[in-house]
Amino acid sequence: MAAKEVKFGRSAREKMLRGVDILADAVKVTLGPKGRNVVIDKSFGAPRITKDGVSVAKEIELEDKFENMGAQMVREVASKTNDIAGDGTTTATVLAQAIVREGAKAVAAGMNPMDLKRGIDLAVAEVVKDLLAKAKKINTSDEVAQVGTISANGEKQIGLDIAEAMQKVGNEGVITVEEAKTAETELEVVEGMQFDRGYLSPYFVTNPEKMVADLEDAFILLHEKKLSNLQAMLPVLEAVVQTGKPLLIIAEDVEGEALATLVVNKLRGGLKIAAVKAPGFGDRRKAMLEDIAILTGGTVISEDLGIKLESVTLDMLGRAKKVSITKENTTIVDGAGQKSDIEGRVAQIKAQIEETTSDYDREKLQERLAKLAGGVAVIRVGGATEVEVKEKKDRIDDALNATRAAVQEGIVPGGGVALLRSSVKITVKGENDDQDAGVNIVRRALQSPARQIVENAGDEASIVVGKILEKNTDDFGYNAQTGEYGDMIAMGIIDPVKVVRTALQDAASVASLLITTEAMIAELPKKDAPAMPGGMGGMGGMDMM
């Protein structure tokens, strides 16, 4: 085991704080409508330009092990917020930095870190309650477009595209973002279905950079039982290989010899194949397999129907123009099913929704209906160069996640104003002075996103924040894009509550851990042994006797 270096107390916290600052300072320049770009050097290909906080955070790795620990903890804040809300990563990073900074000062002044943490938790709980109470529900397509525009750094067209996509496939529909072959960004709605099962083995992946398995013009084998014996599958596999088309297997499970053989064939390049588990459980699994069969024009291979795997022919397999499989989801696009069959199935599910008395069953049936009838909206991102397309795609991903979050929990005034207002409304008291100090840390930290947005726009943060707080109306704030004050919601500057809430909760959670850290352990850097000295040269002028 390698020797470790241990740092305690103040020296540990100082190192950690330096790491937090390096990462947060790189991320926070991207905040707001006038946020700046960050250029990231790639080991291959052109550098990447982005305004996406989590993309910047993920690239940062520091040489000093202790500083790196601090940076990685804050990177965790950005990733967690991104996973849950899909946006707000920069806000979360700014909040985490502010709480850690203030907290470290308080600990250095001799306060109890655990009491500070309790105070922080009390304040955060009150702010979250206040945010949820202030939330305004989203009803119109225009409001959806406004949320999308803000998250895309003020690009109106992106907001409009997302609003249109949501209108076409419904709020629960599936919307994917792809790179276009042209310079224009366009929206396309494709009939399709997505379910929450990913590939059974990472060896099925065709795009290692994104960890996605893409199958074009694929056959689909639907089997309701487990597949473990390869022998029964051989006839259908051989028939598919003859066609040169890829095959997707959807079964209860694929294991043992069957899975191993499929993987080996995929790696050798003889067979383009992927396998996923069937979605759902029990009777619902049968129904969902039947849905997929109707969508793709295939047949579910089921012993109940007297169909054996050995006797399966190509015409029993479903067909789809494209299948995309990630670690968690499978999307089937443009199935070869008959329109009349799909409409019949939709009508049948609608009738079941009418009849059912269970809320849970109704919800699951509506999910199936959305998958069959809603389809998949694809936003194809265009641009003059590859770098521009990637940067735009990042922003559209953020905007899409933000709009979904807004539809779920509602919206509040944007531009950091909601948190600014909540900072004044914190009334909770701790059990002692140290807990009160924790509450005050949150009170001050809540101003940091608004201040950062104003600073990035080149204005004086203290003056702007003072002016906003002078007015006692919730929606009054500062538009950093135009430099005007006014009603934020009327100006279309709004944030989804889910994004703001998640950013604060994740930031406070990680910042509290950093404040309560008293020791840090890291491996000592390896010292390379010095090279062997060169041999002595021959000594001239000395003849042998």
Curated annotation (Swiss-Prot):
SUPFAM superfamilies: GroEL apical domain-like, GroEL equatorial domain-like, GroEL-intermediate domain like. It is found in: Cytoplasm. GO terms for cellular component: cytoplasm. Induction: By heat shock. GO terms for molecular function: ATP binding; ATP-dependent protein folding chaperone; isomerase activity; unfolded protein binding. InterPro entries: Chaperonin_Cpn60_CS, Cpn60/GroEL, Cpn60/GroEL/TCP-1, GroEL-like_apical_dom_sf, GROEL-like_equatorial_sf, TCP-1-like_intermed_sf. ATP binds at residues 30-33, 51, 87-91, 415, 495. Its main location: cytoplasm. It comes from the Bacteria. It catalyses: ATP + H2O + a folded polypeptide = ADP + phosphate + an unfolded polypeptide. Its EC number is 5.6.1.7. One of its GO terms (biological process) is protein refolding. Keywords: ATP-binding, Chaperone, Cytoplasm, Isomerase, Nucleotide-binding, Stress response. NCBIfam families: GroEL, PRK00013.1, PRK12849.1, PRK12850.1, PRK12851.1. Belongs to the chaperonin (HSP60) family. Together with its co-chaperonin GroES, plays an essential role in assisting protein folding. The GroEL-GroES system forms a nano-cage that allows encapsulation of the non-native substrate proteins and provides a physical environment optimized to promote and accelerate protein folding. Forms a cylinder of 14 subunits composed of two heptameric rings stacked back-to-back. Interacts with the co-chaperonin GroES. This is Chaperonin GroEL 1. It comes from Rhizobium meliloti (strain 1021) (Ensifer meliloti). The lineage of its organism: Bacteria, Pseudomonadati, Pseudomonadota, Alphaproteobacteria, Hyphomicrobiales.
